[in-house]
Amino acid sequence: MAGTMHLLTAVSLILMLSSANAESTVYNLLTSPDCLPDLLHGGLAEQGVTELYILTTFRIQPGTGNTIFSLYNPRDNSKYFEFSVFGKANKAILRYLRRDGRMSAVTFNKLNLADGEKHRLLFHLKGLEVGHPGGFPHSQGALPVPGVELHLDCRLVETLRDLPAVFNGLNNHQAVELKTMQGKAQEGLEELKLAYGDSVENVASLQDCHTQSDSVQALGLNTKQLTTQMLELTKVINELKDVLIQQVKETSFLRNTISECQACGLSGAEVVKPKCAPGVCFRDDMCIETAEGVECGPCPDGYTGDGYSCDDVDECQFNPCFPGVRCVNMAPGFRCEACPLGFTGKPLEGVGVAYAQTHKQVCDDIDECKGPDNGGCTANSICVNSVGSYQCGRCKTGFTGDQIRGCKPEKSCGNRLQNPCDPNAQCTEERDGTITCQCGIGWAGNGYLCGKDTDIDGYPDERLRCRDPTCRKDNCVTVPNSGQEDADGDGKGDACDPDADGDGILNEQDNCWLTPNINQQNSDKDSHGDACDNCVRVDNPDQRDTDSDGLGDACDDDMDGDGLKNFLDNCQRVKNRDQLDRDGDGVGDACDSCPDIPNPNQSDIDNDLVGDSCDTNQDSDGDGHQDSKDNCPMVINSSQLDTDKDGIGDECDDDDDNDGIPDSLPPGPDNCRLVPNPEQIDDNNDGVGDICESDFDQDKVIDRIDNCPENAEITLTDFRAYQTVVLDPEGDAQIDPNWVVLNQGMEIVQTMNSDPGLAVGYTAFSGVDFEGTFHVNTVTDDDYAGFIFGYQDSSSFYVVMWKQTEQTYWQATPFRAVAEPGIQLKAVKSKTGPGEHLRNSLWHTGDTNDQVRLLWKDPRNVGWKDKVSYRWYLQHRPQVGYIRVRFYEGTELVADSGVTIDTTMRGGRLGVFCFSQENIIWSNLKYRCNDTIPEDFQEFSTQHGMDPL
């Protein structure tokens, strides 16, 4: 036995040495990228390739980032396989499309690849599916376990137990192209190769990584040991020769002995026949006694074997179940689970191969569009049934509108007058009876003429034949820029102009990308050139300028412009010439978070604009204002509107304008509830007083363009004044967000790959409609972006957030957080507040105790697409807890939460949200005060047994 083992060892060594001399097939993808589609569309499988290598060598400058290479579909810009480096965050991310069609991401932290040095990367992909086996040594025998090994600078750093789908063969209709990093000075991609047909050790040598085979290392072999093994092999063979000679002699002796026994008549001895006994056959009832002995009958249905032993047949391999339905193998038999959502049919059970081959589960599509409710689509709209689902389309011929506002007769507009609007616009009757037209989502113009608006920023792709500003051609057709900023006046908007200031220096390298400065002079080294630096000789990277006088706060001796020098001003960033300070804490009342209680440090740990010294967190009505500061402590009124400034909020004031005419009781109702008019003059007897006929709140903005016609404090959407809230203030996992506000507060851009953070406006709302265009203007990274509403403090708010791919958060403390792709609506009510618990809870898709509740998730599990614009439309009515959010891609409704009821936050402020995602644009932002309860709330209440209003 020992000799046999020596023989096997020597033979295996010879096989290893022979395979180590195999030659690789190597493709240089930098010079021949066109070979890649043929290989991925079946070329590798046809050659029997089961192991594949991708080698790349690159150099990235410190503090920068780049996508090293990416395999993607040029038709829809979707990714198959991508490796990116983030220098500032000191990490790298591998993203890939899984075989189940979902994106996955692996994050490598504390990986300093952006250091100006050359780095070598080797991907070893194993377990590829084979089309015609036998092409290479690796295709012989058992296939390797599918997975990916990542070697960095000749060192194994990660092993994935999954194989990206792109390397298992693409369908012919799935286009694939290669995109490589665009290097700047002092950096670039030096090598990108694809290899197969050899060992990882030999392939690694192409990158000057000289390693021994793992198996050779384990044996500790060298040339001397090989010689010793060969000598031992010769010795063993000689010993085996002697043994065989002896065995031949013994066999001959036995044959002669048997012959002699037969000659003596011993062959007549009675032979005892075996009989059936328990355990002889697979089942006792299968045992048969014959003249020749015992036989076993055939295996029963659902099993295979010789009758003595029978093994269960996996009938599921014959695909008896409806596509998408789970098949459960049993012993014996199989079972198909219920038909998927959108289909109807019976479960299927059976036993045996024949049954599985001749019986297939049948699931019939449910036509949701049949029936009186039109599939749930708005009346008079088109419901399109599809296999397993349905979609709500445009209004039927003769009707106009959309799924939000309903479909009305095309020739009428509320007052039954002829509809003057464009077919792609909505017609609205205002409170004074006038008609306004507004282009629908995905369209832009003046409402009477509408054109296609690809990026949904409010400007048409092509110029329209009308004079309104919104009829002009969009200067960035595919990048939303609702302000149409164009610094160099070349007709190409700053958002899509690679040299926005026209000075010949590209934006990425220009230290004043909106101001021409060929010399790039920078006296203070704060990354802002002198030509655009509001403090030329003082470092101020944030460029903050409170009074907008062109002089940055860092070098302005009167930051708020109130005429008082900073060292004398008790509110340095808030104008207050009176310098009132009731509590004498050195902080003026105008900027004091506790004006009646001394708190010189102005600490506000929960970011609710109320200092910790006077923050009681006692809020009886849940509207975000503590009772001691709430002008209606027992009535929900998050906006705190007090028209007559009498200290009583309008929501609980019987006479809002204090003109002596009650709002609703006799001798009212007041025909101008917000404007004093004791005479109640109404010449046209339309029920609206003359003084407020077209401007109900008398804020000098007519109602039809007023975002809040019943609130004189709010007229237009404006986020220029905002509060920044950092949700993970501790640690150095990432950096804080960088917010840039454009278009007079109606557009926000976040530029950094950052920790979770919020930019929150200071205006609080009760009922509100909030809409905007969401766009990720990069192909780098795949994380969270969204918006918030009902913000009351840094532990209490609603967030709508969208993740592109599935990913486990790279910080496993305090718990493992897994993000799934798709849109999520969450209610945040955190007991800990900003920190690692809230951070991981926001990342995680699902509920987390005492932190976050998932109210709704888009069942499609679809991530956002790179450089694609989406329009959201939110309705929030905190008085009844009504929430509904819709998302559009172009003109198509792609996600709808439906009616969601939650009363955790009874109103609050609005803002935007980001988490580890850079280059996010929130464009064409609009908010409108609206306390009207939508019609679908009544339907929802009836169906769910709630108390109607």
Swiss-Prot record:
SUPFAM superfamilies: Assembly domain of cartilage oligomeric matrix protein, Concanavalin A-like lectins/glucanases, EGF/Laminin, TSP type-3 repeat
Signal peptide boundaries: 1-22
InterPro entries for this protein: ConA-like_dom_sf (IPR013320), EGF-like_Ca-bd_dom (IPR001881), EGF-like_dom (IPR000742), EGF_Ca-bd_CS (IPR018097), NOTCH1_EGF-like (IPR049883), Thrombospondin_3-like_rpt (IPR003367), Thrombospondin_3_rpt (IPR017897), Thrombospondin_C (IPR008859)
Domain Laminin G-like, first and last residues per copy: 23-198
GO biological processes: cell adhesion; positive regulation of cell division; response to unfolded protein; tendon development
Chain positions of TSP type-3 repeats: 452-484, 485-520, 521-543, 544-579, 580-602, 603-640, 641-680, 681-716
Keyword Repeat: yes
Glycosylated residues in this chain: N601, N637, N930
Domain TSP C-terminal: 720-934
Database matches in CDD domains: EGF_CA
Region (Disordered): 578-671
Cellular compartments per GO CC: collagen-containing extracellular matrix; endoplasmic reticulum; extracellular region; extracellular space; sarcoplasmic reticulum
Subcellular location as annotated: Endoplasmic reticulum; Sarcoplasmic reticulum; Secreted; Secreted, Extracellular space
Disulfide partners: C276-C287, C281-C296, C299-C310, C316-C327, C321-C336, C339-C363, C369-C383, C377-C392, C395-C407, C413-C427, C421-C437, C439-C450, C466-C471, C476-C496, C512-C532, C535-C555, C571-C591, C594-C614, C632-C652, C672-C692, C708-C929
Residue ranges constituting the EGF-like domain according to the UniProt record: 312-349, 365-408, 409-451
Keywords: Calcium, Cell adhesion, Disulfide bond, EGF-like domain, Endoplasmic reticulum, Extracellular matrix, Glycoprotein, Growth factor, Mitogen, Repeat, Sarcoplasmic reticulum, Secreted, Signal, Unfolded protein response
Compositional bias segments (type: Acidic residues): 649-660
GO molecular function: calcium ion binding; growth factor activity; heparin binding
Coiled coil: none
Purpose: Adhesive glycoprotein that mediates cell-to-cell and cell-to-matrix interactions and may be involved in various processes including cellular proliferation, migration, adhesion and attachment. May play a role in ER stress response.
PANTHER family: THROMBOSPONDIN, THROMBOSPONDIN-4
Family stated for the protein in its record: Belongs to the thrombospondin family.
Quaternary context: Homotrimer; disulfide-linked.
This protein's name: Thrombospondin-4-B
Origin species: Danio rerio (Zebrafish)
Lineage, uppermost ranks: Eukaryota, Metazoa, Chordata, Craniata, Vertebrata
